[in-house]
From Swiss-Prot:
Keywords: Cobalamin biosynthesis, Glutamine amidotransferase. Pathway: Cofactor biosynthesis; adenosylcobalamin biosynthesis. One of its GO terms (molecular function) is catalytic activity. SUPFAM superfamilies: Class I glutamine amidotransferase-like (SSF52317), P-loop containing nucleoside triphosphate hydrolases (SSF52540). Residues 250-438 form the GATase cobBQ-type domain. InterPro entries: Class_I_gatase-like (IPR029062), CobQ/CobB/MinD/ParA_Nub-bd_dom (IPR002586), CobQ_GATase1 (IPR033949), CobQ_N (IPR047045), CobQ_synth (IPR004459), GATase_3 (IPR011698), P-loop_NTPase (IPR027417). GO terms for biological process: cobalamin biosynthetic process. Catalyzes amidations at positions B, D, E, and G on adenosylcobyrinic A,C-diamide. NH(2) groups are provided by glutamine, and one molecule of ATP is hydrogenolyzed for each amidation. The active site is at C331, H430. Pfam families: CbiA, GATase_3. Belongs to the CobB/CobQ family. CobQ subfamily. This is Cobyric acid synthase.
Length: 488
C-alpha cells in the first residue's frame, strides 16, 4: 500500500483541505484511496453505518475518495468537553473522559495499537492511504507522545508533504524551523513543500522558492491560491463564521453559540442557501429579532443550559418564542427545550435535576450508554411523507409528558417533536438540514411569516451539493499541485 502523509508547520495551515483534495485527485486517477488520521481532536463527529463515531473531517475525506466512511479512518477521536477534559472515542466507541495528562498515561499504548490495527485493516482494501497530521510535527514537548504525525509517517514510510500557510506571514521561517526540528529520518520522509493560501502575483515568490529548494533540497510542489473553504475548521468556528459574506438575504437565523457547541456542520446547508443569513449569537449578546433561533448540539448539555440561564439568554429565547418567534433545538438543544433534565449519576458534572427552557413537554434523563446510529425516517412535518436521513449521537433518553400538545416530527415517535403551532421544533437528528426538500419546507415557514414566496422544495440533497464542492476544491488544488515527487 502506497502512503502519503500531509503535515503542517502550524495548526490551520490547510492540511484538511489539501488532504481532501488529494483524496479526490488520486481517486480520479484510479487509485483505491482511503483517508486516515490517527488521532483527531474535533467538535464535529460523524456516525458510520456500523454505529461507530469518527471525525467529520475524515468522513468528508472518505466521500472525496469515493468510499464509505469507516471508523478505521480515524481510530482515535477526542471530543473536548470543557474543563480541560475530552471524551475519548477508540475505534468508534466511547472509552472514557480524561484530562490531557491522564490521557497519555492511560491511552497512549491503547491508541497506538488501535492505529496499527486500523492501518492493517485499511491495507487489505485500499492501495493508497492519504494521511493527515495534526498541528505541527515538530512540537518538541509533545513529540514523544504524538500519535498523529511523524510516528505514523515512519510506520508507513509515507511520502510526506509539508504545508505552510503563507497568508499568516513568516512562511519561510516556519518551513525551515519545522525541518530543523525534525529528526533526520523524519526529515528524509519530506518529499515536497506546499505553500498554501497564497494571494498575489505568483512570480513574486520565485526567488524565495529558488532559495528554499536550494537550502532544503526539497521541491516546492505547489503554491495553492486562497480557496474559500467549503468545510469548517474541525476544531473551531473561526472559518465557519467568516465563510460567507452575504450582502442581501431574505431571512436571518440566529444560532446560539454554546460554549461547548458540537456538530456545527449541521448548519453548512443553511450557510449554502443564498437567501439565508446565519448569525452566531454568544449567550451574553443581544438576541435581536431573527426569523428563527436554533439551539445546536453540545458536548455538555446541562452545563451549557446553565450558561444560558445565568446569562439571561434562556429568558430571552422564551420571550422571543412567546412573541411569535420560531425556535428549534437539535440534539442537546432539543433536550434543553424540555421541562427537566435529570443527571442522577453525575455524568455531566454534579448530580441532580435541572430545569429546562420548558418550551416542550419533555423530560430527559442522562444515561451512560451513548446512542450512535444512522437513521432513515419519514417526516410528518413541515411537509408529510418526506424521506429524511441523518444520524443520532447522544446520551440522553427523552420522554413526552403531554403527548396531546405536541406532534411527532417523524414516523419514529421519539426522534423529534413540534408544538401544535409549528413554532417550537426539537429533534435528535444531526444532518437534518442536509435533506434539501425538508430544509426548504422548513425555511418556507419562515418566509411565509415575512410574506415572501416559497422556495422550490424539489431540490437535491446537500450530499449532491457536497460532491460539486469537492470536485471544485480538487480542481483548484490539482491546477497548482505536482504530486509526482510523492508518488515516485
Amino acid at each position: 500500500m502506497k502512503a502519503i502523509m500531509v503535515v503542517g508547520t502550524t495548526s490551520h495551515a490547510g492540511k484538511s483541505l489539501i488532504t481532501t483534495a488529494i483524496c479526490r485527485i488520486l481517486s480520479r486517477r484510479g487509485w483505491k484511496v482511503t483517508p486516515f488520521k490517527g488521532q483527531n481532536m474535533a467538535l464535529n463527529s460523524y456516525v458510520t453505518s456500523t454505529g461507530g463515531e469518527m471525525g467529520h473531517a475524515q468522513a468528508v475525506q472518505a466521500w472525496a475518495a469515493g468510499v464509505t466512511p469507516a471508523i478505521e479512518m480515524n481510530p482515535i477521536l477526542l471530543k473536548p468537553q470543557g474543563d480541560m477534559t475530552s471524551q475519548v472515542i477508540i475505534k468508534g466507541k466511547a472509552s472514557g473522559t480524561v484530562g490531557a495528562v491522564d490521557y497519555y498515561q492511560q491511552y497512549f499504548d491503547i491508541g497506538w495499537n488501535a492505529i496499527q490495527e486500523s492501518l492493517e485493516t485499511l491495507s487489505q482494501e485500499f492501495n493508497m492511504i492519504v494521511c493527515e497530521g495534526a498541528g505541527s510535527p515538530a512540537e518538541i514537548n509533545l513529540k514523544h507522545r504524538d500519535l498523529t504525525n511523524m510516528r505514523v509517517a515512519k510506520h508507513l514510510n509515507a511520502s510526506t508533504i509539508l504545508v505552510v500557510d503563507i497568508d499568516r506571514g513568516g512562511a519561510f521561517a516556519h518551513i525551515i524551523g519545522t525541518l530543523e526540528l525534525l529528526e533526520p529520518e523524519e526529515r528524509n520522509l519530506i518529499k515536497g513543500i506546499v505553500i498554501n493560501k497564497f494571494r498575489g502575483q505568483r512570480s513574486l515568490l520565485d526567488s524565495g522558492i529558488h532559495w528554499l529548494e536550494k537550502k532544503t533540497n526539497i521541491p516546492v510542489i505547489g503554491v495553492i491560491p486562497w480557496i474559500n473553504e467549503a468545510f469548517p475548521a474541525e476544531d473551531s468556528l473561526s472559518i465557519l463564521e467568516q465563510r460567507y459574506n452575504k450582502h442581501t438575504t431574505d431571512i436571518t437565523i440566529a444560532i446560539i453559540r454554546l460554549p461547548r457547541i458540537s456538530n456545527f456542520t449541521d448548519f453548512e446547508p443553511l450557510e449554502a442557501e443564498s437567501s439565508v443569513k446565519i448569525k452566531y449569537i454568544h449567550p451574553n449578546d443581544s438576541l435581536g429579532d431573527p426569523d428563527a433561533i436554533i439551539i445546536p448540539g453540545t458536548k455538555t448539555t446541562i452545563n451549557d443550559l446553565l450558561v444560558l440561564q445565568k446569562s439571561g439568554m434562556a429568558e430571552a429565547i422564551k420571550s422571543y418564542q412567546s412573541s411569535g418567534g420560531i425556535v428549534m433545538g437539535i440534539c442537546g438543544g432539543f433536550q434543553m427545550l424540555g421541562e427537566v433534565l435529570i443527571d442522577s449519576q453525575g455524568l455531566e458534572g454534579k448530580q441532580g435535576e435541572y430545569k429546562g427552557l420548558e418550551l416542550l413537554p419533555l423530560i430527559t434523563t442522562i444515561t451512560p450508554k451513548k446512542i450512535a446510529s444512522q437513521r432513515q425516517v419519514i417526516a410528518n412535518y413541515p411537509l408529510g411523507n418526506l424521506p429524511v436521513i441523518g444520524y443520532e449521537i447522544h446520551q440522553g433518553r427523552t420522554i413526552v409528558t403531554k403527548p396531546d400538545i405536541v406532534k411527532p416530527l417523524f414516523n419514529d415517535y421519539d426522534l423529534g417533536f413540534v408544538d401544535s403551532y409549528d413554532s417550537i421544533w426539537g429533534n435528535y437528528l444531526h444532518g437534518i438540514f442536509d435533506n434539501g426538500s425538508w430544509r426548504r419546507s422548513w425555511l418556507n415557514i419562515l418566509r411565509h411569516k415575512r410574506g415572501l414566496n416559497s422556495l422550490p422544495t424539489s431540490i437535491s440533497n446537500y450530499r449532491e451539493q457536497r460532491e460539486i464542492i469537492l470536485d471544485s476544491i480538487a480542481d483548484k488544488v490539482n491546477e497548482h499541485l505536482d504530486l509526482k515527487p510523492v508518488l515516485t
